[in-house]
Each structure stands twice: as structure tokens, then as C-alpha cells.
Amino acid sequence: MKHPSLIFLTGFSGSGKSTIGPLLANSLGYDFLDLDKEIERQADKPITRIFAEEGEDHFRERERAMLESIVGRKELVVSLGGGALQNNDCFSLIISSGTMVYLHSSPLILAKRMSHKTDRPLMKGENGERLSSEEIEKKILALLEHREPRYKTAQIMVETDTKRIGTTVEELTRKIERYVRRAEKNQNSHSQTKKQSRK
């Protein structure tokens, strides 16, 4: 069953999911789960090592199994990995079980934020070398071309380029609370209609 209060934060790496997620969960009074960090905890190694040693397909399988374990929960904010939606099984689980929120940032801003990180596969070239900011931006543009159509299927979207984190959290809290109320009301009305039709 779909639970509107199961919130999936999606967006490219560097869009603010891991920073905004726990603050948003606290504002809503929900629990919080960072999917990538939970996968790292269970695997007992960072994502860069999972990719290097097991390959992306195996990482996506871990991701799918983790998502299956939380389907059905309510009042939970989940920060997804940047590429989670590209796995068809993961995408189907997400859209059928909760509410998706897209944190949108421009490629230039994403590249600037990513240049400060060293723990992401995106930062590395084919031979494991560190990429320049310009190379990262080109890589982001290429990946966004494939990923953005699914990002844009989200029920809620906010820009995270220039807003303060607190402002973004407040905006998201209002939008999510309004959306969840409306969705739950529609679900209840639908349930009542089905019950009456059985009489």
C-alpha cells in the first residue's frame, strides 16, 4: 500500500539530500534514513569501495534490498542515492510506496559542491584519478540528461541552488504536510467508496 508520509528525497549527488533530510525529518516529526550511509554501514565499507570491488550492479542490488525493507513504513524521510531511480526495480518500489521529493540544483552548483568531496564514484575518472571541476560538470550534465526525466516524476520539487537550508526545510515542510493531508484524505474517501460499493 502507498503511504504518502513515506518521503523519498531524490536529486543529484550534492543537491543537499543528506544535509536537508535529517532537518526535514525533525521538522515533520518523522524518522530519517540515509540509504547510502545505511548500505555503507551494512557492507562495512564506503560506497567507493563497493563500486570498485563489487561493481555498480551489485551496489544497486543492495539498494533495492534496502528499499524493500522499508516499503510500508510511515512518517519516514529517506535520502536516496543520486542514481537510485535509474534502477527500474528501485524506481517502481519508490513510486508505488510513497511520496517523492526532488531537490533540484544546477550543474554548475553541483560541480562546485562535489569538488569538496572525495568519497563519491562521480569524482573519479575511469582509472580512479580525481577529476577537475570542469570534468565533473561535464560528467554531471551527461548523467542529468539520463536521470532528470525520472527526477521530474516527483510529486514535489524545490530549488536548492541559492536558498538557505533553513528556508528550504520550511518550504518543504509546508509542501509535504499539505500534500500528505490531501493524499490521505483522498485515500480515505476512496476506501469509503469501495466499502459502500460492496454493501
Curated annotation (Swiss-Prot):
Cofactor: Mg(2+)
Main location: cytoplasm
Cofactor note: Binds 1 Mg(2+) ion per subunit.
Alphabetical UniProt keywords: Amino-acid biosynthesis, Aromatic amino acid biosynthesis, ATP-binding, Cytoplasm, Kinase, Magnesium, Metal-binding, Nucleotide-binding, Transferase
Organism the protein comes from: Chlorobium phaeobacteroides (strain BS1)
Record function comment: Catalyzes the specific phosphorylation of the 3-hydroxyl group of shikimic acid using ATP as a cosubstrate.
UniProt enzyme class: transferase
GO biological process: amino acid biosynthetic process; aromatic amino acid family biosynthetic process; chorismate biosynthetic process
Enzyme Commission number, as recorded: 2.7.1.71
Domain of life: Bacteria
Reaction catalysed by this enzyme: shikimate + ATP = 3-phosphoshikimate + ADP + H(+)
Gene Ontology CC terms: cytosol
Cellular compartment(s): Cytoplasm
Pathway: Metabolic intermediate biosynthesis; chorismate biosynthesis; chorismate from D-erythrose 4-phosphate and phosphoenolpyruvate: step 5/7
S-S bonds: none
Binding-site residues, substrate: 36, 60, 82, 147
Residue positions binding Mg(2+): 18
One MF term in the entry's GO annotations: ATP binding
Subunit structure: Monomer.
Protein family membership: Belongs to the shikimate kinase family.
Disordered: annotated segments: 179-199
Taxon lineage: Bacteria, Pseudomonadati, Chlorobiota, Chlorobiia, Chlorobiales
Parts of the chain that traverse the membrane: none
Residues engaged in binding ATP: 14-19, 120
UniProt-recorded name of the protein: Shikimate kinase
